[in-house]
Amino acid sequence: MSSHVSNNSILDPVTFWNQANKSLIRYGGDFAPKIIVRAKGCCVYDEQDNAILDFTSGQMSAILGHSHPDITACIEKNLPKLVHLFSGFLSPPVVQLATELSDLLPDGLDKTLFLSTGGEANEAALRMAKVYTNKYECVAFSSSWHGVTGGAASLTFAAARRGYGPALPGSYTIPEPNPKLSPFRDAKGNYDWQKELDYSFYMLDKQSTGSLACMIVETILSTGGIIELPQGYLKALKKKCEERGMLLIIDEAQTGIGRTGSMFSFEHHGIVPDILTLSKSLGAGTALAAVITSEEIEKVCYDNGFVFYTTHASDPLPAAIGSTVLKVVKRDNLVEKAKISGELLRSDLLRLKDKHPLIVDVRGLGLLQGIEIASCTDPSKPSDFLGTVIGDKCLELGMNCNIVHLRGIGGVFRIAPPLTVTDEEIHKAIEIFDSALTFTAKEFSGSY
C-alpha cells in the first residue's frame, strides 16, 4: 500500500515516528528519540536545531567531524567525474589511495583491496587467510565484534549469536585479556595474561582438527567494553600464530587513522600483522574499507584462485575521499592532536571517577575511552540499566555518548569524539556527563 508524505510534514515528530515505525526494519535495539536533520563539526542537529555533541563520531567513523570542508570539496570535485565502475576497471583515485597507504604502512603491508564496510573487509580477510593457508579454522576473542555477515558473524562473540542457526565450521574463541575478569593469576595474585594465553592455545589445539588458518583481533576491543591488549600480548599472540602456520589479522575499524594517538594502533605493540583491515575512520563517515596484506600473501591467494567480487570493490569516489582523509589527518597533525586531546579527555574522566562512585573504571587510549558504570548493588559488574539511564540523560542534555545498548555491556560507555574535537567541546561533554551521573545517582541509589 502506498502513502505520500511531504518533506515538510515528515518533520512533524508525530508524523515522522509514525512513518518510521510503519516503514523501517529495526536492526538492533530501539532508535534514539531524535530526528537528525543536519550535522556540522562535532555536533548533529535535530529538527528544532538543537545541537547534540556527537561523542561517538557517528558510527565511530567521522574522525574529521561532520561536513568537513575538505571532504565536501572532494565530493563536489569528483562526483561529476567518477562515482562507480565495473569491478574489473581501475581508476586513478584507487591506485593513488593504495599507494598512499603502502607508503604509510611498514613493509609487509603492501597491497590493498578496497571495499565498503568493516564487516565486508573482515570477510575478505578471512577468505584470504583460508585460501593462503589452505585451512579453514578461524579464531577470535570471546568479546569480539567483527561484523554480521557469515564468516565475520561467526567470529563475533560479544553479542548477536543466537537465533541465526549454526556458525561456520571451525569458528573458535579464546578469552580476551581482561584483567578484571580473568581467573589467571600469578603467585602474588596479579593478572597473568601469558599463562592465560598459553592455556587458551592449549585448549584451542585440543579442539582443532589441524586446520588453523588465522586469528582476527582488535587492539582495543570496543564492543567488548574498551579492553586494551596489554603490552607484549600481541607479540606473544603473533608467535603463537606463527608456530601453527596461522595468519594474524588485525581489525582496525575503530582504532585506525589516528584515533589512539598513533596512525595505526598496532604500532603501539611493535608488530606487523599479516593482514590489516581498515574501515570506519578511513572514509571518515563514508562507505570505504580496505584489506591490506603483503605481496607474498596476495600472490599466493591470486595463484590459488582468490575471488571477492562485490558491487563496490574499487569504487573511485570513496577512494578519492580516503585520500582526502589521509591528507587532512597529516596536514592538520591530527594524530598528535588525538594523543593530546585524549590525555585531556582521560584526565577529565578520571576526575569524574573520583567524584562519582558509579564509575568504577576509565580505560582506553587516545580518543577512544571507556567508562565502566557499576551496579549500585554489585560494583564488580557493569550495569546495563544504569548505563541506559545515563546514556538517555546525556542525550536529553545534548550529548550522544553511546552507540548501542547491548545486553551485558550496556554499562561501559565508548567515548570517541572526532579527532577535530576542541577542548571546549570536551569540557562541555564532561559537564553533561557529570549532570547525568548526578541525576542517576540521586534517582536510583541503592535500587540497582
From Swiss-Prot:
Taxonomic path: Eukaryota, Fungi, Dikarya, Ascomycota, Taphrinomycotina
Protein name (record): Uncharacterized aminotransferase C1039.07c
Modified residues (N6-(pyridoxal phosphate)lysine): K280
UniProt main location, coarse: cytoplasm
One MF term in the entry's GO annotations: transaminase activity
Superkingdom of origin: Eukaryota
Family, per entry: Belongs to the class-III pyridoxal-phosphate-dependent aminotransferase family.
Mitochondrion as UniProt keyword: yes
GO cellular component: cytosol; mitochondrion
Catalytic activity, EC: 2.6.-.-
InterPro entries per the UniProt record, alphabetical: Aminotrans_3 (IPR005814), Aminotrans_3_PPA_site (IPR049704), PyrdxlP-dep_Trfase (IPR015424), PyrdxlP-dep_Trfase_major (IPR015421), PyrdxlP-dep_Trfase_small (IPR015422)
Subcellular location, record wording: Cytoplasm; Mitochondrion
PANTHER family for this protein: ALANINE--GLYOXYLATE AMINOTRANSFERASE 2-LIKE (PTHR45688:SF13), PTHR45688
Keyword flag NAD: no
Keyword annotations from UniProtKB, A to Z: Aminotransferase, Cytoplasm, Mitochondrion, Pyridoxal phosphate, Transferase
PROSITE patterns named in the record: AA_TRANSFER_CLASS_3 (PS00600)
